Amino acid sequence: MTNKAHSQGSKKTIQGSMPAIVTPMFEDGSLDYPGLRALLDWHVSEGSDGIVIVGTSGESPTVSVEEHCELIRVTVEQIAGRIPVIAGTGGNSTQEAIELTHFAKKVGADASLQVVPYYNKPTQEGMYAHFKKIAESVDLPVILYNVPGRTVADMAGDTVVRLAGVPGIIGIKDATGSLERGTLLINDLKRAGHHEFSVFSGDDLTAAMLMLMGGHGNISVTANVAPRLMHELCVAAMSDDVKRTREIQYQLIAVHKAMFIEANPIPVKWALHEMGKITAGIRLPLTPLSSSLREPLKAALKQANLL
């Protein structure tokens, strides 16, 4: 596939399987930085093509600004240039997003992930102005993040096409879960001449199909527990190997579904703890996985040969 997003400066290619990594915590809710370092090394060894830190799966709403910055710093330090680091620095305050993005740039992140502002429900023009301001304020590549199931505000395809023309905005994580919307967006971007703008899936169930239709990778929850398989899935789908894509997708489909039997990242953190990869902590208002759902999740992991 020739269309690849690149981070400015380092020119690292941003594509393929990028886990939206969890934030390891001790049972008292304090952050487990040694555990994070070990988890990052595991992802590199298992073939992950990039790391997204402090996103939805990383419990970004419940870490302090100081913790947010330290998570980015530790991740960049531990990865040490081996794969791209995409820092979740978005929010519903434009100025705060700019400040966090400045920090990410300073410590060496390769790009930023900027969520559609939530709660304050901006108009399409407000979204455009918000993302444009961030891109103009910090010399760090911006990946847009549309996840209307969480933000309520939903960025229209026309707005994405407009933003694709803003220097520094290099792609979007489309977490609408709509294959129709994703493929139409890819087509609209091509028709508008934005051939270097990347569309990443943010929905594991539909990611394989979106990549077969021209998507450039997957910012994934499932990749937290199956990094090698998700890397192989992205390679297969992006090289039009339909047979191998289908094989891996069916191996993982129960896991894709199980990752959302309760609100993300509750199931994925429980799964990683069960796999021996992280400590057991999670922060309120999120709570540990309901006991009645543990066996079904364990069964999905076993079905995919992850346990």
From Swiss-Prot:
Annotated GO biological processes are:
diaminopimelate biosynthetic process; lysine biosynthetic process via diaminopimelate
Pathway involvement? Amino-acid biosynthesis; L-lysine biosynthesis via DAP pathway; (S)-tetrahydrodipicolinate from L-aspartate: step 3/4
Q: Does the keyword Protein biosynthesis apply?
A: no
Query: Known catalysed reaction(s)?
Result: L-aspartate 4-semialdehyde + pyruvate = (2S,4S)-4-hydroxy-2,3,4,5-tetrahydrodipicolinate + H2O + H(+)
| Residues at the active site | Y145, K173
GO MF terms here are: 4-hydroxy-tetrahydrodipicolinate synthase activity
- Please state where this protein is localized: Cytoplasm
Its Enzyme Commission number(s) read 4.3.3.7
Binding residues for pyruvate: S57, I219
Keywords, A to Z? Amino-acid biosynthesis, Cytoplasm, Diaminopimelate biosynthesis, Lyase, Lysine biosynthesis, Schiff base
Quote the cellular component terms of the Gene Ontology held in the record.
cytosol
Site (Part of a proton relay during catalysis): residue numbering on this chain: T56, Y119
Enzymatic class: lyase
- InterPro entries assigned: Aldolase_TIM, DapA, DapA-like, Schiff_base-form_aldolases_AS
Q: What family, per the record?
A: Belongs to the DapA family.
Function summary: Catalyzes the condensation of (S)-aspartate-beta-semialdehyde [(S)-ASA] and pyruvate to 4-hydroxy-tetrahydrodipicolinate (HTPA).
**How does the record describe its quaternary structure?**
Homotetramer; dimer of dimers.
Question: Would you tell me the protein name for this molecule?
Answer: 4-hydroxy-tetrahydrodipicolinate synthase
Its organism's taxonomic lineage begins at: Bacteria, Pseudomonadati, Pseudomonadota, Betaproteobacteria, Burkholderiales
